Amino acid sequence: MKIYVVYDSEGEHTKVLAEAIAEGARENDAAEVFIDHVDQADIRKLKDMDAIIWGCPGHFGTISSGLKTWIDRLGYLWAEGELINKVGAVFCTTATTHGGLEMTMHNLITPMFHQGMIVVGLPGNVPENALYGSYYGAGVTCPVDSDELMSEEGIQLGRALGRRVSQVTGNLTAGQ
């Protein structure tokens, strides 16, 4: 199965989370995982993927302009139904606790529903998500005054999302 992680990152925080998600997905030996910054991401690759995970820093509860511009170029895939039944998931980082993580993830999920994708999040019984995460995807607060780019909890949450997407995608593609 092929999984594509696409991210926008301005201060490297979201890049670290994207890499953790890719690591988690790669724990499944059947997964071939690709990861690209949005500036290098090729929308033509999407129709060959089984799962697509995209994310960005949250900007006042909405998608970063770089990822939004990229998503807005997916209209022809929508018109041709190329992403229908592909697994989708999202992730986000913000600088503050109330920086709009969940609203940003809602905004990231919406285009996936328009494309007919099967969106997966992180259920509450996933240990990494129980006290730290969000049901909508991997959302991590990365305070600007911290010396570390990403907390260990954030990295574990990213890996958990990657594992979940890989597991669900494997289950859905096993019968094909």
From Swiss-Prot:
GO molecular function annotations of the record: FMN binding; NAD(P)H dehydrogenase (quinone) activity
Species of the source: Bacillus subtilis (strain 168)
Domain Flavodoxin-like, chain residue ranges per copy: 3-162
Top-level taxon: Bacteria
InterPro entries: Flavodoxin/NO_synth, Flavoprotein-like_sf, FMN_Rdtase-like_dom
GO cellular component, one term: membrane
Name of protein: Uncharacterized protein YhcB
Pfam families hit by this protein: FMN_red
